[in-house]
């Protein structure tokens, strides 16, 4: 009887801990106040440095991803479609790959990505952490308004529908 009680207790604790970790990873990180996006620069696949200020004045969706991450790869076709549809309205996607360059080059060669992909590697992981990705998970997405303020941080997959609920009002701001 004692052993059964111990097993049940351990199972309940494991269940509660698992739910807490799952909630931390999959739940959107809501932020009540907008904070400025820190400036940083990263290279593209050709080695050319790009600063975030290149896209100042646009609503930016900054997505940290990796080629080995199934949810990351699932998001990308929707992001590509939304970039095509809303680019002229002020939306700009930026992908920050947390991979080595070779797998990223291979991925880009076989997929039609229509937004800039920057190479984050180790520096990208630190930047994601500084932006609020405290558990170093991918995908991790940061949404920035036209004024350069972070309005949303999302750990885990983000659907096009969820994204547009956040982005649509931002695109209408002056």
Residue positions per predicted region:
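N-terminal targeting signals for export/organelle localization
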Residues: 1-41, 174
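Conserved redox-active cysteine motifs that mediate thiol-disulfide chemistry
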Residues: 56, 64-81
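Conserved hydrophobic/aromatic "anchor" residues
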Residues: 40, 64-65, 107, 115
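Short pre-active-site segment immediately N-terminal to redox-active cysteine/selenocysteine motifs
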Residues: 58-60, 64-68, 100, 137
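Structural microenvironment flanking redox-active thiols in thiol-disulfide oxidoreductases
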Residues: 73-112, 122-129
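Thiol/disulfide oxidoreductase modules built on the thioredoxin-like
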Residues: 109-113, 120-168
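A short beta-strand-turn-helix
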Residues: 39-60, 86, 128
């Amino acid at each position: 009887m004692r052993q059964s009680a111990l097993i049940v207790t351990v199972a309940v604790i494991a269940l509660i801990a698992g739910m807490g970790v799952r909630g931390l990873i999959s739940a959107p990180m809501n932020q009540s106040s907008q904070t400025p996006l820190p400036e940083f620069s990263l290279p593209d696949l050709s080695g050319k440095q790009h600063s975030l200020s290149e896209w100042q004045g646009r609503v930016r969706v900054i997505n940290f991803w990796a080629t080995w991450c199934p949810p990351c790869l699932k998001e990308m076709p929707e992001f590509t479609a939304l970039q095509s549809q809303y680019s002229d309205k002020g939306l700009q996607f930026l992908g920050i790959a947390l991979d080595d360059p070779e797998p990223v080059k291979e991925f880009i060669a076989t997929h039609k990505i229509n937004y800039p992909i920057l190479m984050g590697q180790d520096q990208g992981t630190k930047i994601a952490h500084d932006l609020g990705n405290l558990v170093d998970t991918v995908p991790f997405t940061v949404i920035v308004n036209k004024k350069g303020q972070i309005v949303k941080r999302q750990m885990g997959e983000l659907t096009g529908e969820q994204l547009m609920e956040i982005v649509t009002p931002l695109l209408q701001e002056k």
